[in-house]
Amino acid sequence: PTDRDCRVNQPFIGASGQVLFDALKKCNLSRNHVYMTYAIKRQVISASQAKLQGIKTPVVSKQEFDTYKNVLLTEISYLPNCKYILALGSYAIKILTGNDSVMHWRGSVIDVSIAGRDYKVICGYNPTLVALDPKLEIVFRMDMNKLSRILEGKFQLANIYAEINPSFKDAMSYIADVRYSSRPFAYDIETMGNETACVGLAISENHGMCINFRTQGTNRFSTREELVIRRALQTLFSTPEGKSVAQNANFDNYWLWYKDRIQVSQTWFDTMLAHHLLYPPLPHSLGFIVSQYTDDPYYKDEGKLWKAEGEIDDFWRYNVKDCCYTLIAQRRMLVELEEQDLSKFFFDHVMKLQPHLTRMTVGGLLCDTQLKETITDELTRTVGEAKELCQVAAQKATGRADYAFNPASPKQCGKLFFEDLKLVGRGNSTNKENRERMYKHSRTNSDSRAVITNIDSYLRDAKFLSTYASATIDPDDRFRCEYKQTGVINAPGRLSSSAVMWGSGLNLQNIPERAKPMFIADEGYEFSYFDAAQIEARFVAMLANIPQWKAQFEMARVNPGSYDAHCALASVMWNIPYENVPKEDFVVDPVTGLSSHTLRFTAKRCRHGLNYRMAYDRLATTANLSMNDAQIAYNLYHRTTPEIKDWWRTTIERAKRDRKITTPFGRRWILMERWDEDALDSIIAFVPQSMAGDHIASVIYKCERDVRWPRDARIVLNIHDALIAINRPADGPLVRALMRSYAEEPIDFGDDSIIVPADFKVSKPGEDGIHRWSTLGKLKERPELLSVT
């Protein structure tokens, strides 16, 4: 019970009741039609106490849980007309179904028997939680719709039949059936021990085959038979007219290519990517998708439970379920894409990009293993020394010779900062931003500043050691990463990256400068790089219709190297001649040798942050300004560019009115829950950030699909607004010309268009003849522009 429920002695009063009965109203049910009770009959802890103690989920003892379980089951048995039960929240779900995790089981309808009578239990979130988190509201309504389907007689399970342990002949026959069928087919792999355990296929929504290569302890096929099956699968996945469907196909595809040398030429439909395009705010796992598009209960635990139960056949059946559910979702999503005018963008951009990201993962990037080992050894010593310096600084600052702490522990650092040294920051966070605030605070003495400086140095080196220097590479001495098309929540269209599923590699989009020498080109190759200059700010200039910015950016484009848009902004903000603005971000004092940031740097930081509703206190941190200087810069920025706030206002008004925003490229943001002020920042940033991501991503497939692109050249890295290709030096001019030509294609904004200039670099060989990421240098002349279509 909530505090308010306890006061009036009635369940679901206030906001939680409104959430629940708004959903039940669509089932033609009111309070008079339902019996309400608590799974746990007492309030374990009040909301105020829970907040004070930092308790998110109150815990009930096993003894008390068992007592309330018996009470609830007895209570239900006394309801003669009850047929359906809404189990709302983790305790209700566990008591009635025995299942843990409301996040997994929400949306499931489970048949249970209580005191000899059968019931259907519909699982969902606790309405109290939904009332506090608007993002859960759409999910809650989806789950309550299951009750509506039951009452209307529309509830229907998929009834999937899984054909497992096929003979060689049956496996080959089914692959042929799939290949020569004109219908879409789903595929899915499962892995064990870092090897492919099976490949599942389905051309029917209720029947599929798992071609499992092994049993619990033996191989199922001879070496010859398995080779023939794998070749048949390669032929199937290479068929141009085949309509292959998968959930998160990029994983299956890069795994099959790297591990099994089976290359999926082009997945026709990825349900995860389609769902991400249709409903960006929702989760996109297959478990969630199944709860949205089918009436079947949660099943994803079946992929793990077989290990405990020792029944491997359940694993193969699970594989077939994945295939059939994916096919069910694909059929429904295709209709939704067409109805919502998203199908063209989905097939012509989202799906077109995917095989190129797979290629980037499989190709990887060569590592200088000798340098990596040297850096690791040196850093291991450095980190140990830095940790000792932290102890010495803390002992001096506290005046305690025996003081000891772990600088990697936020809890122990928090005790040092706030209890022992009495430092002042914002709250009790020990993150980098708050450490900077504490360092700059007037009450922080020199000894305490030395503590912060040493902790910063230790954390920087320790992170570099664990994240970069000690990163696992593959047996072929390559770094790899998995590029995710759904990875950036607030900017769909931008790519994120992470380690690959077999455990090696790392996020290659945030590599620090001192790690870049480890990344090298293959022998006989060089790196070609381009960065889309101020792409987001240029898009903001168009969206907010800022004539002055448009003119500045165009002047910078047609006069590369001689005119700088950030200097122009600084000139306007501080009302000084353009030629008096330093062209660098930092200048060094010839007397002290200390560097300080320039007006250009501050203007650039303003443009990067203040476009998206950043407040001046945050600007103080990002631009390394005092609060007073940050407020001055904030006011100057918006005074000289009033169009920015006008753009915010019209964007928010449109979002409230239409509940959606669509970029000029065709990607959509959609508001599915009730309006929430916290969504404002992401709404403002959505169009420029998503457009930037989609534009850069499009250059990847446009280049590699161009018939002029050299056969052995490839894009190897996406670094936000930049791409890096690897090519033979003789092919460099052509590679860079194609990259520029596609990167600088005019982008249509309706009444106007814009060209975003691309700044280029090329790697230079060192004394050892090796081209490294760290040796990229600016080109003296811009690449040629070619005609593209």
Question: Predicted regions span which residues?
Answer:
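Conserved catalytic core of nucleic-acid polymerases
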Residues: 355-362, 484-490, 571-718, 729, ...
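Acidic beta-strand-to-loop metal/phosphate-binding motif
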Residues: 83-89, 241-249, 529
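Conserved "right-hand" nucleotidyltransferase catalytic core of DNA-directed polymerases
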Residues: 149-219, 238, 281, 292-293, ...
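A polyanion-binding, active-site-adjacent surface
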Residues: 1-155
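Conserved RNase H-like, two-metal-ion catalytic cores of nucleic-acid enzymes
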Residues: 5, 9-21, 25-29, 156-288, ...
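Alpha-helix capping/helix-boundary segments
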Residues: 91-93, 251-252, 412
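Short hydrophobic/aromatic beta-strand micro-patches
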Residues: 724-728
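C-terminal polymerase-core module
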Residues: 381-388, 392, 399-452, 639-688, ...
